[in-house]
């Protein structure tokens, strides 16, 4: 095999970086490209219900596998995906967006083709995507196409941001040398500048030597930019108390003896708030300081000794060191930190949240009880996905087993995101370990935006747990504004009929309304193994919400009302 098509080259390269499932929809400008998927052993085409869901699925897949790929068609297809792509950009998720575009000659002649705006401008959609992409490429020359594909894949993986790649329909079946595949794409980070890195390390070590009450705070980009192992070792070597933010949940093992809880500014538990805010040194790893991640910007550190490790810079107090990447900086710090921290005397960390008190089995379910009890159901290795709304806030009260991966969209907050993300995560989990459980918590309102993707789960025999929190509408919106407003109401669905409606044959659908029903279901041994797709409708009062969401809603309403 001396020559292969450009389309096959793309998919062979994706397989080399462990992308095995491709998301998207067929369209006449990408059909020839899609033919090439089936030429690559081990590669599969998911085939989504719509492009928005496909983008959400690509996001969920990338969070577990490191990057993903979605394929859409020019204009109508690619624009339908952009909300999801924007979310991946905001949340630091590497998604390669491949768009099948009209032929080079059609573009040059400015033909009045379908899926265009009718003005001869074939670059307008590319320009739109450029604002939410780390880089873009529009292939026009077969000779440079392989190098451009390699550049786009590398950038997607290394930057953990979306990348746009336009492939004209007339080029995908042209051939390129197969020998190009023999040289792997370089996915390594560029080393830090040695002098800048050394200055950072020396300054951080000095702050550690002087600290009496330091803490470590892990945030979203600790996971996104692959610094979890370094952060864990930092905790082990120093024994500093360690905390996570809502977006960082799952980036530190919560059974670690030095794990102290979730810090959300003023929304934190009193013990966590005191422990973090009284620190005389904060080592922050991968911070993403958005409103819902910080309790509406209510961080209140008493110290100015704050070190921020980021994917592309490090900040020490008020001094910024551009280009000093956290992964390498942490690795260098780990070689010296034990000696610097030898004078530290460990202080107690806030204790693990207490278990629920025993109540009568007939007790109606409430949010506070459910989220504590969820921790009893989870086990090591689970992927836990929480929708924007009560789920994203309630999960902060759940104590994770070790090696649990949390997926949420706290910054972008597009409701309905998690249905597609669950599909993508389920594909990824199946490739990593078929026994790995994928567990979704989503509200009844959010589900109505993206429910079609459950049919894709069924078509592929995927087996996630779908916990649908039925609180009769948009509770998070009611808490912020319009408690009884008609616009926060939805049509109630017969949720237990969804799986058979979408064609499921081997499934379980059950409704739980009381603590006894919840406990009986979640402690059943057969239920605990992911042998089939399951939908669990959880009945909850309309205005019931986790306590931290009630507080956040008040803060958000106040912010919205400010002049």
Curated annotation (Swiss-Prot):
It comes from Kluyveromyces lactis (strain ATCC 8585 / CBS 2359 / DSM 70799 / NBRC 1267 / NRRL Y-1140 / WM37) (Yeast). Pyruvate binds at residues 28, 115, 477. The gene is PDC1. It catalyses: a 2-oxocarboxylate + H(+) = an aldehyde + CO2; pyruvate + H(+) = acetaldehyde + CO2. One of its GO terms (biological process) is aromatic amino acid family catabolic process to alcohol via Ehrlich pathway. Its EC number is 4.1.1.1. Homotetramer. It comes from the Eukaryota. GO terms for molecular function: magnesium ion binding; pyruvate decarboxylase activity; thiamine pyrophosphate binding. Belongs to the TPP enzyme family. This is Pyruvate decarboxylase. Binds 1 Mg(2+) per subunit. Binds 1 thiamine pyrophosphate per subunit. Mg(2+) binds at residues 444, 471, 473. Thiamine diphosphate binds at residues 390, 413-415, 445-446, 471-476. Its cofactor is Mg(2+); thiamine diphosphate. Gene3D superfamilies: 3.40.50.970, TPP-binding domain.
